[in-house]
Amino acid sequence: MNCPKCVSPLNEIAIENVALDFCPGCKGIWFDKDEMAFVIELKNDLPNPQAERTAGRATVFPCPRCDTKLEELKFVPLQDLLVDRCPSCHGIWLDNGELQKVGTIAAGFKAPKSRVVRVALQIKLKAGGFF
């Protein structure tokens, strides 16, 4: 698979039994369907992200998994973080620094979990100064 932003080959990193794909060029991360939910423990960390979710704005970037054009949408309603999502395979692309923003958003809710922080740290360590 190649990075949708800079076209560099993505490297696979195993983090807490999940194989994430990261770009050594632009430092983005690809999450296949449901990997993001596992990493941030979505059911516990964030309010219902499907509520108020509508189709995103089309981008020129191809999905690294299925080559469908990614769409840009808000990660959660009422927040400013925009992420790229594949409307076909439902994977999510986070640009460099966006995983930390996900952690900040998760920390603002009633019962935040620390998995997103652990995952970001492990990616940083395994990727050798990733962030």
Model-derived segments and their meaning:
Residues I29-K43, H90-A107:
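Short metal-binding segments enriched for Cys and/or His
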Residues N17-G56:
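A broadly conserved sequence feature marking short terminus-proximal activation segments
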Residues V18-G28, D80-I92:
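Cysteine-rich micro-motifs
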Residues L10-N11, F31, E71, L94:
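Short functional micro-motifs and their immediate structural scaffolds
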